[in-house]
């Protein structure tokens, strides 16, 4: 999964939920043998980082992040572990950053860390 994300090449049918404006702004459409695929524009890709981390340990990150995807992971942790993981993620995100989670995940007990902005989207406070 991380290797696919790092390459920045995705099947075009995987763009559900992206507006036409965002598709045009952030992606290039494949042509010829690459038809049916899209690639993240190089000027955006150079600002992207993908890292495997152990969420139950302190995160080995020096920079802060604008966006974190942590989808369908937290459901496997008990409530105290979820809270500890959210605190770790909170520390490595910039204020106003966006956290994407899975549909089954809800962090209503972490209102002092994140505010719900959509069904699966939280904003870091």
Language-model features: where?
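Glycine-rich, phosphate-binding/catalytic loops in enzymes
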Residues: 10-11, 85-87, 117-118
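A short glycine-rich, Lys/Arg-flanked "PGG" loop and its adjoining helix->strand segment in the class I
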Residues: 83-95
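Extended basic-aromatic, gly/pro-enriched interface segments that bind polyanionic ligands
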Residues: 1-69, 73-81, 106-108
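Conserved beta-strand signature within the Rossmann-like core of class I S-adenosyl-L-methionine
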Residues: 95-103
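Core SAM-dependent methyltransferase catalytic element
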Residues: 67, 108-125
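Generic structural signal for beta-strand residues in well-ordered domains
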Residues: 41-43, 92, 115
């Amino acid at each position: 999964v991380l290797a696919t994300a790092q390459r920045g090449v995705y099947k075009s049918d995987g763009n559900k939920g992206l507006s036409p404006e965002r598709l045009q702004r952030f992606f290039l459409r494949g042509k010829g043998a690459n038809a049916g695929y899209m690639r993240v524009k190089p000027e955006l890709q150079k600002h992207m980082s993908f890292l495997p981390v152990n969420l139950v340990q302190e995160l080995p990150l020096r920079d802060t992040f604008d966006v974190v995807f942590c989808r369908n992971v937290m459901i496997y942790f008990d409530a105290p572990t979820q809270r500890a993981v959210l605190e770790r993620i909170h520390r490595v995100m910039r204020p106003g950053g966006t956290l994407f989670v899975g549909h089954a995940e809800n962090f209503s007990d972490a209102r002092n860390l994140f505010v719900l902005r959509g069904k699966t989207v939280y904003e870091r406070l």
